[in-house]
Amino acid sequence: MYIIMGVFTTIVNIASFYILVEIMNVDYKAATVAAWILSVLFAYITNKLYVFQQKTHDLQSLLKELTAFFSVRVLSLGIDLGMMIILVGQFNTNETLAKILDNAVIVVVNYVASKWLVFKKTKEEGV
């Protein structure tokens, strides 16, 4: 299920980036950050509901989980933006192609971080 939701999240990221850069003429760095925000929101919802099937029973737990998810994903933003600056800024790679390449790395980083840091099961949940 993670792969399916990861594909959808990647599509959200690349499509929003493409629209911002190619249609709205937004700078690729700003578009990278905006696409990251949209895709992280999408990823949180789909990971919570469909991948890790986490149930949150109170607002405090939800906010803690959401904060952890976004905090961990800041690492992916750094990787995303860094790769875009290197690929586009240094190697003159097409912006959309660079976004596709960097998403391949981001999917792996995000899965590991989500599984082990955000949606980890506690002893009470059977682990």
From Swiss-Prot:
GO terms for biological process: polysaccharide biosynthetic process. This is Uncharacterized membrane protein YwcD. The keyword Transmembrane helix applies. One of its GO terms (cellular component) is plasma membrane. It comes from Bacillus subtilis (strain 168). It is a multi-pass membrane protein. Keywords: Cell membrane, Membrane, Transmembrane, Transmembrane helix. It holds the Pfam family GtrA_DPMS_TM. The chain crosses the membrane at residues 1-21, 32-52, 68-88, 100-120. Belongs to the GtrA family. InterPro entries: GtrA_CellWall_Glycosyl, GtrA_DPMS_TM. It is found in: Cell membrane.
